[in-house]
Curated annotation (Swiss-Prot):
Keywords: Hydrolase. It holds the Pfam family Lactamase_B_2. Belongs to the UPF0173 family. This is UPF0173 metal-dependent hydrolase EAT1b_0495. InterPro entries: Metallo-B-lactamas, RibonucZ/Hydroxyglut_hydro, UPF0173, UPF0173_UPF0282_UlaG_hydrolase. Signal peptide: none annotated. One of its GO terms (molecular function) is hydrolase activity.
Length: 224
């Protein structure tokens, strides 16, 4: 599996020839200069509706024809705008061509602004993706929560993408607990350093995980 990290919470996967992109935030992302219109994912997975997770959804979906996978409310919003969608809800799973996706809970919020009015778009979520090669967990934006222990018991997680920025999500201390509960073989910190309130020392976080910690520099593709 090839994994590309674009900074913040935007992660791309190439799985058996299928391209998946999670939470496309590129245009305003200070960690990347990638032109979102050049990306051609087959699927766009959205954890929630905040701007820093969906900024480039429409641009990329128009250019690529990607199917948008999101909570029912958010998927319905994009479906009414003419996009191909697959709606899900917390606890549900579906077998896609690249693997089985389970939508997990996340403790956060999920809205975007329509004019001056914030509109809520269902629950925030995370994704556990089981492929022929690896099992990956993208936690989305979340606090630490006890069901992560159950995820670690039920799934053999190879790579976990965990937010460490604090303030809006869990910080490094709670993310270390999450890493232990999940029993993930590798842990990649995300959602840090994009804005001043979420400035963190990601290398120090990884050092505390020893060989399990994996710091991926933005705009880098690695093979796992």
């Amino acid at each position: 599996m090839n994994i590309t990290y674009y900074g913040h919470a935007t992660v791309g996967f190439e799985i058996d020839g299928v391209n998946v992109l999670i939470d496309p935030f590129l245009t305003s992302n200070p960690h990347t200069d990638v032109d979102p219109s050049t990306l051609r994912p087959d699927y766009l997975l959205l954890t929630h509706a905040h701007f820093d997770h969906i900024e480039d959804v429409e641009l990329i979906a128009k250019a690529s024809g990607a199917t948008i996978v999101a909570t029912h409310e958010l998927a319905t919003y994009y479906e009414k705008k003419g996009f191909s969608v697959h709606g899900m809800n917390i606890g549900g799973g579906h077998a896609f061509p690249f693997g089985r996706v389970t939508m997990t809970q996340a403790f956060h919020s999920s809205s975007f602004d329509m004019g001056d009015t914030p509109v809520y778009m269902g629950m925030p979520a995370g994704f556990i993706i089981e492929t022929n090669e690896l099992t990956v967990y993208h936690a989305g934006d979340t606090s630490l929560f006890s069901d992560m222990k159950m995820y670690g018991e039920r799934f053999e997680i190879d790579v976990a993408f965990l937010p460490i920025g604090d303030n809006f999500t869990m910080g490094p201390t709670d993310a270390l607990d999450a890493a232990q509960w999940l029993q993930a073989k590798r842990v990649v910190p995300i959602h840090f350093d994009t804005f001043p309130p979420i400035k963190q020392d990601a290398q120090a976080f990884c050092d505390q995980l020893h060989r399990r910690g994996l710091l991926i520099e933005p705009n880098t593709t690695i093979e796992i």
